Design a protein with these regions (language model features):
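Long, structured ligand/cofactor-binding scaffold of large enzymes
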Residues: 5-117, 124, 129-132
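Glycine- and acidic
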Residues: 7-11, 31, 60-62, 181-185, ...
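Alpha-helix capping and helix-loop boundary segments enriched in small/acidic/polar residues
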Residues: 11, 63-70, 102-107, 139-146, ...
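Short coil/turn segments at secondary-structure boundaries
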Residues: 35-36, 40-43, 90-92, 185-192, ...
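Core structural elements
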Residues: 44-53, 191-202, 227-229
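Mobile "lid/hinge" segments at catalytic clefts and subdomain interfaces of large enzymes
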Residues: 118-205
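Accessory "access/gating" subregions that flank catalytic or transport cores
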Residues: 198-238
Length: 238
């Protein structure tokens, strides 16, 4: 890899950028094709993306709902403020659906999985999905709710571990399932979110093996900087 003044040459940047976008798209396909509920499987009311180690959005699936990606960085930072990234271990994840901490509404559950490479966090794979039911006073969306506690189960910014808390009927899985009218579909869709995040993490690790973790991080930073330049130019032209 040839790097000039900390930036990759245009060819390397383009190749890695497209690989990151492809990984985000593959995450989206994995999510909706493995989902249980029609709202995700058919309606595709979900989104997936890859964040850098600070929680900045780098790439997103353009086959799902782009608007949902807007909540990723805000919700991520709410989780990281309570559970710093430096404390995360392999298998840990963030989860949240709290509207006051970045989520759109309680039906949108966000999951963030750290991407480790040689013991270092390179970034995060993220998935958000609108769930068919999250409890509350009525199935689905409660149109008679007078406060958001009536809308369903509130998951504040939290950190859990996949093996200890979710897999094999772990305590978090059982707790969420006990508050849901259709646990098979809601839990199945959360499983699909984890599966999508696993795909994203695997693809980023493959890039790190091929190009080096330093190079991938530089490519992520340049994607964000390039987007900022484009947006600033568009605003300046108004």
């Amino acid at each position: 890899m040839s790097v000039t003044e900390g930036r990759l040459n245009p060819v390397d940047q383009a190749v890695i950028s497209q690989a990151l976008l492809s990984a985000a798209r593959e995450m989206g396909i994995k999510l909706y094709r493995s989902a249980y509920s029609p709202i995700v499987r058919d309606g595709k009311d979900a989104s997936t993306g890859i964040l850098d180690a600070e929680g900045n959005a780098v790439a997103q699936s353009d086959e799902l709902i782009p608007m949902l990606v807007g909540s990723l960085s805000i919700t991520f930072r709410s989780c990281a403020a309570l559970y710093p990234v430096a404390t995360l271990k392999e298998g840990d994840f963030y989860i949240c659906n709290h509207p006051y901490h970045g989520a759109h509404h309680l039906q949108d559950i966000l999951i963030f999985v750290p991407i480790f490479h040689d013991g270092t966090i390179i970034g995060f794979s993220a998935a958000v999905a609108h769930h068919l039911d999250v409890g509350g006073g009525a199935p689905g969306l409660n149109s008679t709710a007078t406060d958001f506690y009536q809308e369903g189960l509130v998951i504040p910014p939290s950190k859990y571990n996949l093996a200890a808390d979710w897999n094999d009927e772990g305590p978090l899985r059982r707790f969420i399932g006990a508050n849901i009218r259709v646990p098979e579909q809601t839990l199945g869709d959360i499983d699909s979110q984890f599966a999508a995040c696993a795909v994203g993490a695997a693809r980023v690790r493959e890039m790190c093996d091929k190009y080096s973790a330093t190079t991938v991080r530089r490519a992520m930073a340049e994607m964000i900087a390039y987007t900022e330049r484009r947006v600033r130019a568009a605003i300046a032209a108004i």
